[in-house]
Each structure stands twice: as C-alpha cells, then as structure tokens.
C-alpha cells in the first residue's frame, strides 16, 4: 500500500481521490471535474458504531448516527452519487445488513435500482458482541432506473464472492480486499 497526505479539497493522482464530503455537491463536482463515472464501487459508513480491535481502536466518521440522521446522510450521499455517474453506470454498494432496507430506500429515492445482492464471504468472521459472528458482507449490484447498465463480466459471474479479508486493517478499520473490486471490474 501507499501512504498519502491529503488536506480538505485536495485532488491527487490518476485514481482521483478527494479529501472532502461525499454528501456535498461542490465537493463531488470538484472531484469529478465535469466527468461522469461508468462504474463505481463504494463503501459508505455502515452506521454500526464500529471500534477497531487493534491497539489504536480506529473508528469511522459518521458511523454512529441516529436513524433519522443516517437516512438523511444516505439520501444526500446517493443524490450526489447519482449526479456523478452516467445513465449506464454499473454500481456496487457495500452496506450493513442491519440498514439494508434503509440503504435500498435511499438508493431508490435517488433513482438507483438494485439488481442483485452479492455476498462477499470472508475466510474468517469478525469478532463482535452479536450472537452470530458475521463472516460475510452484502454488496448491492445496481444501475440507474430506466437505463441498461454497463456490464463488465462474462456469463459465469455469480453472487457469492469468496475472498480473504485483509489480515490487518492498517489503513482503514474495515478494509476491503482489492480482489473484490477487481471482481467488479472483471
């Protein structure tokens, strides 16, 4: 991995990274610079008040909101999301099972239509206080309502993605493996 330093409103590198607020129109417009994305893989906050199990106990901003605040946040997030993608964009949205109905409702209010639920099956479960330990994460595959989606896969793709989770979360408390993004692009 690479380490980068960013300050608010920085846009750096070939991968277009913005340190900003994905719910603010001006930040998203600065990031996209008039362009529209044909494919997006995103991992918005799950609103589960996550605290990492490492010594530094990493947390995630906007991950402990009230129901009303979270729905408002997700509505703003998906409204901005819709503005920066082409009508035929392929969309992948990681989300928490606990907020699935609200996430889907926010997507639909923004004109984003879920097509299928992908399940990322990890090689090990996540420790927590729940009765059942999560060994998977759901990912919506979606498109813009009323438009066909760009499809990057072949006809052998399926809805179960078995990929190892990163062995350490040094950059983000709930890191996703590069391999699941690669699968979305394949």
Give the label of every model feature segment.
Residues 1-186:
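Core catalytic lobe of class I
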